[in-house]
């Protein structure tokens, strides 16, 4: 039986875990830069499959997904992949924010968020320059 190789790299890779196509498109437009590689999955099982092969620098995680809640997935990711930064995004109320942060999310953004908010969060967590590429 062969072991799967897990790819790790210093490149700035971001995994977006979001089931809404429009939100994914918006995030892709906002975040497409030469120094960031974006990957996208639509559910938690897809995220787990992706993480078993490639570990990103940062995960943008929606809360309400077809196969579970992102807020519950945060603690799992932080235990198994402690170096991965997590930006939780949700349209739910402040109680979700509190739980997400308690579970280990590095930042929380409430939908709808602005381009500046998401870029500020990512730049801060990945130590990227403050200038805007667009």
Task: For each feature predicted by the language model, list its residue ranges.
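Two-component/phosphorelay signaling modules centered on CheY-like receiver
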Residues: 21-39
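Active-site residues of response regulator receiver
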Residues: 62
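Alpha4 helix (beta4-alpha4-beta5 surface) of REC/receiver domains from two-component response regulators
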Residues: 72, 92-109
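Acidic catalytic/metal-coordinating carboxylates
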Residues: 43, 69-72
């Amino acid at each position: 039986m062969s072991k799967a190789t897990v790819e790790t790299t210093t490149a700035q890779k971001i995994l977006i875990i979001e089931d809404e196509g429009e939100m994914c498109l918006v995030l892709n437009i906002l975040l497409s830069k030469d120094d960031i590689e974006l990957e996208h999955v639509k559910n938690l099982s897809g995220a787990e499959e992706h993480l078993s092969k490639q570990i990103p620098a940062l995960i943008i995680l929606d809360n309400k997904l077809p196969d579970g809640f992102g807020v519950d997935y945060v603690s799992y990711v932080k235990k198994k992949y402690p170096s991965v930064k997590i930006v939780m995004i949700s349209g739910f109320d402040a109680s979700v924010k509190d739980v997400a942060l308690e579970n280990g999310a590095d930042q929380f953004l409430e939908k709808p968020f602005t381009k500046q908010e998401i870029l500020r969060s990512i730049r801060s967590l990945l130590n990227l320059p403050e200038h805007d590429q667009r």
